[in-house]
């Protein structure tokens, strides 16, 4: 989604992930960021959102630590840094890549090579990528290919406040 900096993109996605985990049983979600500390921060935002839900909406929590969450309904959320091995071998319903433009090209290429079987095996697997632009890199190529219909990703541009037009 093409939006200005500091407009709550990552927090909005984390809120969506929490909703998805609570209202869907046995789903696996990965929150991946350019640094492990950033991914843990996003999981912390998810925890804050969870703690502020009405009690009737809160699922029982089986595991909650710095890097993961497991709910009573079988849903799991992993937080880690983006790497070639971050989600290898796993089956994920949603993969969230935060600040993806800050991942070095060789790691981004290795990541997508390793995660492609996971993404393509599930017909309903979602990949959400959010980033501040940073030069002509993997993120840039994916975005522009999506705009031209050269890949299966969607580039979303959202402008809710006309005075904050991007570009």
Which sequence ranges carry the predicted segments?
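Phosphate/NTP-binding elements of NTP-utilizing enzymes
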Residues: 1-160, 164
């Amino acid at each position: 989604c093409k939006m200005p900096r500091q407009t709550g993109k990552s927090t909005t996605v984390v809120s969506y992930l929490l909703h998805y985990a609570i209202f869907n049983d046995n789903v696996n979600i990965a929150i991946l960021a350019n640094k492990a500390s950033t991914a843990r921060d996003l999981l912390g935002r998810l925890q804050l959102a969870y703690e502020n839900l009405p009690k009737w909406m809160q699922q029982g929590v089986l595991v909650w630590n710095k890097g993961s969450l497991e709910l009573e309904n079988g849903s799991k959320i992993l937080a880690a840094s983006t790497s070639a091995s971050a989600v290898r071998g796993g089956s994920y319903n949603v993969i969230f890549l935060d600040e993806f433009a800050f991942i070095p090209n060789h790691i981004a290429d290795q990541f997508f090579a390793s995660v492609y079987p996971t993404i393509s095996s599930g017909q309903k697997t979602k990949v959400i990528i959010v980033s501040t632009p940073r030069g002509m890199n993997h993120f840039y190529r994916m975005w522009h290919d999506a705009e031209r219909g050269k890949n299966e990703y969607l580039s979303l541009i959202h402008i809710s406040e006309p005075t904050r037009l991007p570009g």
